[in-house]
Amino acid sequence: MTRVVAQGTFDLIHPGHVHYLEDAAAMGDELHVILARRENVTHKDPPVLPNRQRRDVVAALDPVDHARIGHPEDIFAPIEAIDPDVIALGFDQHHDAAAIEAELADRGLDCAVERASPREARYDDEVLSSGDIADRVLAQRGDSDP
């Protein structure tokens, strides 16, 4: 059985997320998804939704076999526990595949690192970014406190 790991923030799920997970699932037989903890998201605004809610939504998606929240300190700890054959990176994720491969080798994990294919918008106003969804909500409904 080929185990695949996909990872990300998965805040405000959109068609790009679904495409990434479908692509990742096609790389093997079993898809494990690791969701970044809110406190570990430093490369962009933190997620709007809580960790458990994001995990539960991702777990409910058809391509996903297992979903878990990432480790609070060591992003590779869940990868070691899963021992995947493939890590599927999103086509636009900021991760350096070579650095990931080096860390996997240092930890004794024999695992390929692949990039998922991009998902192009299928119509003019389709939104494929959680940040863009949040911006659109603020623009249409106002920037007021709930």
UniProtKB/Swiss-Prot annotation:
Positions of ATP binding: T9, F10, H14, P15, G16, H17, D92
CDD domains: cytidylyltransferase
GO biological process: FAD biosynthetic process; FMN metabolic process
Name of a matching Pfam family: CTP_transf_like
Entry keyword annotation includes Transmembrane: no
Reactions that this protein is recorded to catalyse: FMN + ATP + H(+) = FAD + diphosphate
GO molecular function, one term: ATP binding
Keywords of the record: ATP-binding, FAD, Flavoprotein, FMN, Nucleotide-binding, Nucleotidyltransferase, Transferase
Pathway: Cofactor biosynthesis; FAD biosynthesis; FAD from FMN: step 1/1
Top-tier EC class: transferase
Cofactor: a divalent metal cation
Annotated EC: 2.7.7.2
Subunit structure: Homodimer.
Known function: Catalyzes the transfer of the AMP portion of ATP to flavin mononucleotide (FMN) to produce flavin adenine dinucleotide (FAD) coenzyme.
Similarity section: Belongs to the archaeal FAD synthase family.
Name this protein carries in UniProt: FAD synthase
Organism the protein comes from: Halobacterium salinarum (strain ATCC 700922 / JCM 11081 / NRC-1) (Halobacterium halobium)
Lineage: Archaea, Methanobacteriati, Methanobacteriota, Stenosarchaea group, Halobacteria
Gene coding for it: ribL
